[in-house]
Amino acid sequence: MATEGDKLLGGRFVGSTDPIMEILSSSISTEQRLTEVDIQASMAYAKALEKASILTKTELEKILSGLEKISEESSKGVLVMTQSDEDIQTAIERRLKELIGDIAGKLQTGRSRNEQVVTDLKLLLKSSISVISTHLLQLIKTLVERAAIEIDIIMPGYTHLQKALPIRWSQFLLSHAVALTRDSERLGEVKKRITVLPLGSGALAGNPLEIDRELLRSELDMTSITLNSIDAISERDFVVELISVATLLMIHLSKLAEDLIIFSTTEFGFVTLSDAYSTGSSLLPQKKNPDSLELIRSKAGRVFGRLAAILMVLKGIPSTFSKDLQEDKEAVLDVVDTLTAVLQVATGVISTLQVNKENMEKALTPELLSTDLALYLVRKGMPIRQAQTASGKAVHLAETKGITINNLTLEDLKSISPLFASDVSQVFSVVNSVEQYTAVGGTAKSSVTAQIEQLRELLKKQKEQA
């Protein structure tokens, strides 16, 4: 239990804090990850204090030396947290005083924990986004390069989980890659706002000591400084934005996972997961469970929950700082950890996935070419609605005869429309089917190749910006 003297603001209070209140108030377990960035921010602030003549050069050197020692202790895992340490900022302040004495107290001159916590979080998320972006771009690259290698594999495309049209396997892979590039772009947009520095905003009114905020920005490698001190210490838009982007990203990853789970079932058999990303059954020895994909799918719900939680926290608070904002770190750091793990697992799954080309070919049943039969008639001059009706009649006739549509005779087809001729046989080819979709974005080989090249160029640009 903290005594009066242990409290950071002990001079105002009499008596001790309820121990349960201390547990509720403490965020030290979550905030230990902020240790290094808090030290970086403190070093920058110390330099600004020296420039403002609040610290002498000797005092600055002592403070920087002490902070370097704390950083070293932290990296070695020997930085001790005490019961009175409410958060990482108070822990570092306490340890600095133990190392260099009362001079440590000067570091907080004109600085509030309100600005410290938001600065620390922004600094940490800045580096975290870079890591997440790297993993995301690697996943996109894996999808794109696999699409390039396996461009000649053709599979059924589905709508409503029912066979629709033949498509290239690569077209399927690229559909997910394209969605993920939008997530990569959104991460870049969030990073722009995260790199706006709030340090120098004080508790809410600003800094009264002529602190050079441009110096702080430069020292911490941020892009700009906040415009208004009240907004700076209270806004958590960047937390909501990052978790929102993560939510969309997890939706896309969940969709990819669900597709592959379906394709890996014995009923489909299109793909086989590597043993490294599968598990067995405790009772059924024949089973190979896609646990990696199921976990990716389920983690989406975890991220969605974090978004709802932080929105509810922010919805209920007034302007400036409130203790409610302590919830931001646990929410966003959990999302960061989830994304970091999920993206690496997803990349592992895609890079080791076995494609069962033969099973895909077997699933390319003739009814998939019914639309092509209609398009054949359209090219002969028949309006599309009439062509669809004629194609439907051909399907019905084949079913009545107990044969597949490609086994209908020319006479059978001519009984439906005189526009059918001997060249209709070319319709019943899955290669010819996919090759007619040459428009930009289509599943023809030329179009898929163009998509691959465009995505490679986009990846280069996004990698430079990550």
Swiss-Prot record:
UniProt record, GO biological process: arginine biosynthetic process via ornithine; arginine metabolic process
Alphabetical list of InterPro entries matching this protein: Arg_succ_lyase_C, Argininosuccinate_lyase, Fumarase/histidase_N, Fumarate_lyase_fam, Fumarate_lyase_N, L-Aspartase-like
This protein's UniProt keywords: Eye lens protein
Cysteine pairings via disulfide bonds: none
Membrane-crossing segments per the record: none
Tissue distribution of the protein: Eye lens.
GO cellular component: cytosol
Top-level taxon in the UniProt lineage: Eukaryota
The UniProt record lists the keyword Transmembrane: no
GO MF entries: argininosuccinate lyase activity; structural constituent of eye lens
Pfam family, one: Lyase_1
Residues with PTM Blocked amino end (Ala): A2
Post-translational modification: The N-terminus is blocked.
Subunit structure as annotated in this protein's UniProt entry: Homotetramer.
Function: Delta crystallin, the principal crystallin in embryonic lens, is found only in birds and reptiles.
Sequence similarity: Belongs to the lyase 1 family. Argininosuccinate lyase subfamily.
Name of the featured protein: Delta-1 crystallin
Species for this entry: Gallus gallus
Gene of this entry: ASL1
